[in-house]
Amino acid sequence: MNQKSCNKCIFTMLSESSYGVEFLKVIGVYAVLSLVTLRIKLFVTPNWFDPGGLVTNHYMLTRWKYTNNEQSRVLQWLIPDGLHDLTGWTIPEAYMFQRWFFVLLAFVCFHFFLRKWFKAPAAFGAVCFLAAVMPLSYMNYLQESFSLLLFSFVLILWLIREKLNWQYAVVLLLASMNNETVLILPAVFFFYNFKTWKFKPLCKLTGLTLLTCAPAYIWSAWIRFFTVYICDTQHLGGGWHLDVNLHNLWFSLGISPFQYWKAWYLYIIFVFGLLWLFAYLRFKDKPLFLRRASLMIPLFIICHLITGRIEEVRQMLPLAFIIVPMGMIYMFPELKIEIS
């Protein structure tokens, strides 16, 4: 069979399933959406091309001489470094491809993750909403673990929902090598699988939760020890930001609405807008998985208020995979196809 015939057979095989046809329809649109978000990111990030920016940072990362948390997020710089070696692309080009490709995968994965509960047009709209709010998170800094974090976060949620426990453990480990934010997701695993307060089932679930997340936590502890105590890297900006975050949030609430466009500390509210509220209205009508997963959200926000700079609203974007479908079920209940 020649290559053309083989390609035709693959195309036909994909087209035989309704989801295959849907995939072929949406992937091109999402590829362009990912390109649009990349173009905006590059426009607002001169550091990408400055001599002392991305290339210099990458050089220091590959020699274990950069700052944490970036140094510990090894996949964010190992993948572009591998692309650079394999293809001959420049370092900025390799990082461009990484961001474009993983954001595309996140869009596709989010679309089909939602198809359990929504018809295709609603899933498509949810992805477009995510693409529309992503530029709000873009600032002139380099946080290139973001794209793979976005993809891995929704993929792990999907694996937890389908109770694919060992696949979840493997992906969680790999994702933790890119960004430690995914370490919150074992809470979703526990909440979703919780059934009773009886001692024996509770101990069994606790043990399974700890067992499946142990590799990711062990890796994260080791890489942090290695980078801090062996490589002597410093934590950029420190690890305590609660007082600054709360002060600036309170201050920003009092500024003129005409200044909201640069009120970075309010972006945590703006990024999902009323969907923050809609997600919790008629809560019992939401699917069990989303209700249980949403219990993680307060923990997620508190952790970022304490250890992160909350004006960097990209930190909230992974919550879109929970907040957006919950809000949409309240807004458009007629579009849901299954609640479970």
Which role does the model predict for each range below?
Residues 34-45, 67, 198-285, 318:
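Membrane-lumen/periplasm interface segments of specific transmembrane helices
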Residues 1-36:
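Start-transfer (signal-anchor) and selected internal transmembrane alpha helices
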Residues 66-89:
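Short hydrophobic/aromatic helix or loop-helix immediately within or flanking a transmembrane segment
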